[in-house]
Regions:
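Amphipathic alpha-helical scaffolding segments comprising HEAT/armadillo-like alpha-solenoid repeats
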Residues: 1-2, 23-34, 54-67, 88-100
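Terminal domain-start segments
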Residues: 1-41
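Structural detector for internal amphipathic alpha-helices that build alpha-solenoid repeat scaffolds
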Residues: 10-22, 42-55, 66-70, 74-86, ...
Length: 121
């Protein structure tokens, strides 16, 4: 994970991405938050996640919808674009509705708008 840090050189980050692509349990790349790795790795984590196929991403849709709560967060636009490519049927709709209800409960207007934008594109 340390090699995905945006403070590393481009070469080190490229090596980090190469190694990360080999990780099978990619859920570790869903907005990690610990002492050393948090927003500083999210851009590269989003790249890894966005490369996955729809079927692999399906169980993690709520986490992806949560990532676009604030499009200023590192990696959020990458995830937004990946969600736009996702086939909007079945679990996508269920996950979207679940997270939209959460955004409504929080009265988070920005998040609700982001969710509407990603669904209607």
């Amino acid at each position: 994970m340390d090699l995905l840090d945006w403070n590393r050189t481009e070469e080190e980050q490229a090596e980090g991405l190469r190694l990360a692509r080999q990780v099978k349990a990619f859920n570790v790349f869903l907005q990690p938050c610990d002492k050393r790795n948090n927003k500083n790795v999210w851009d590269n984590c989003a790249l890894i996640v966005s490369e996955k196929e729809d079927a692999i991403l399906e169980p993690y849709l709520p986490y992806l919808f949560a990532w676009i709560q604030d499009l200023n967060w590192p990696g959020a636009w990458c995830i937004f674009e990946r969600l736009q490519e996702y086939k909007k049927e079945g679990m996508y709709d269920f996950g979207w509705q679940e997270i939209y209800a959460c955004a409504q409960a929080l009265e988070d207007e920005v998040w609700m708008e982001n969710l509407k934008m990603v669904r209607h594109t």
